[in-house]
Amino acid sequence: MENKYTHGVLFYHEHSGLKNINQGIGEVTTALSSICKHLSIQLSENEGDIIKYCQEIKTKNYAKDVDILFILGGDGTVNELINGVMTHDLQLPIGILPGGTFNDFTKTLNIAPNHKQASEQMISAQVGKYDVIKINNQYALNFVGLGLIVQNAENVQDGSKDIFGKLSYIGSTVKTLLNPTQFNYQLSIDDKTYSGETTMILTANGPFIGGSRIPLTDLSPQDGELNTFIFNEQSFSILNDIFKKRDSMNWNEITQGIEHIPGKKISLTTDPAMKVDIDGEISLETPIDIEVIPNAIQLLTVNDL
């Protein structure tokens, strides 16, 4: 097989979700080395390392011939690479290999959940261009959320149940595991303003959150638009309804308890200030400014058969 790329760099974190990261590295390099003349394997020891390596690749200090990047890890590790590529304007394709708790965006790319299978898919995968979310000075592929979704992420970090990941818990157990905090919000989306009280706001680029598809057939990370959802109902059985419906369901048939607002530029303030979940990483607080950057990143995509 002819090598597609000259020099690929495979990033990984030793605290990846894989039980044996070294074994995982070995399992993916067979396929990756078949499409790269030269494959570098780069450990990220500390948070922020991948962003530094992206800077070195941009300035050619890492190597002069890097023409593709791979990442083995969960959404948090992928998020760091996305930030490195966007911050340093690396016009390079990225191949994502699942290796963590969730890899929501790999579902969008039709990539297998198993890292070894995913690496084999990279051989025939095609490069697609995707929108990126900019949040203040950070970047994300999939979503920005606050309220209940942040409480959920903090529960996961504490080793508790992942409500969004285990949908059977939504509705009944959510009230016992979490006491959703009401907060006031002021939202501006493409110069239209919205305000009120809620327990959760989500802005989505991709169609999957927590492993489940948002039932909007036209939600796409390639349409130059973001989708904001305001959860107006206090009853969280509504979440169960949303995530269990099929794609063919009309949004308005499901519930009147969630407001859906598409848009490109978003400003959000809350009272009190709220923590913000960006693709599973909690690193900001409100107020925040959000915008979509169309066709900003190149990702290896498996053709949907």
UniProtKB/Swiss-Prot annotation:
Gene Ontology molecular function terms on file: ATP binding; ATP-dependent diacylglycerol kinase activity; metal ion binding
A GO CC term attached to the entry: plasma membrane
Keywords: ATP-binding, Kinase, Lipid biosynthesis, Lipid metabolism, Magnesium, Metal-binding, Nucleotide-binding, Phospholipid biosynthesis, Phospholipid metabolism, Transferase
NCBIfam families per UniProt: YegS/Rv2252/BmrU family lipid kinase
Domain DAGKc: 3-139
Keyword ATP-binding: yes
Gene3D superfamilies assigned to the protein according to its UniProt record, in alphabetical order: 2.60.200.40, Probable inorganic polyphosphate/atp-NAD kinase, domain 1
A Pfam family this chain is assigned to: YegS_C
InterPro entries hit by this protein: ATP-NAD_kinase_N, Diacylglycerol/lipid_kinase, Diacylglycerol_kinase_cat_dom, Lipid_Phosphate_FormReg, NAD/diacylglycerol_kinase_sf, YegS/DAGK_C
EC number: 2.7.1.-
One example of a Gene Ontology biological process annotation: phospholipid biosynthetic process
Required cofactor(s): Mg(2+)
Task performed by this protein: May catalyze the ATP-dependent phosphorylation of lipids other than diacylglycerol (DAG).
Cofactor binding annotation: Binds 1 Mg(2+) ion per subunit. This ion appears to have a structural role and is required for catalytic activity.
Residues involved in ATP binding: S44, G74, D75, G76, T77, V78, N79, E80, T101
Keyword field contains Magnesium: yes
Family stated for the protein in its record: Belongs to the diacylglycerol/lipid kinase family.
Protein name: Putative lipid kinase SAS0691
Superkingdom of the source species: Bacteria
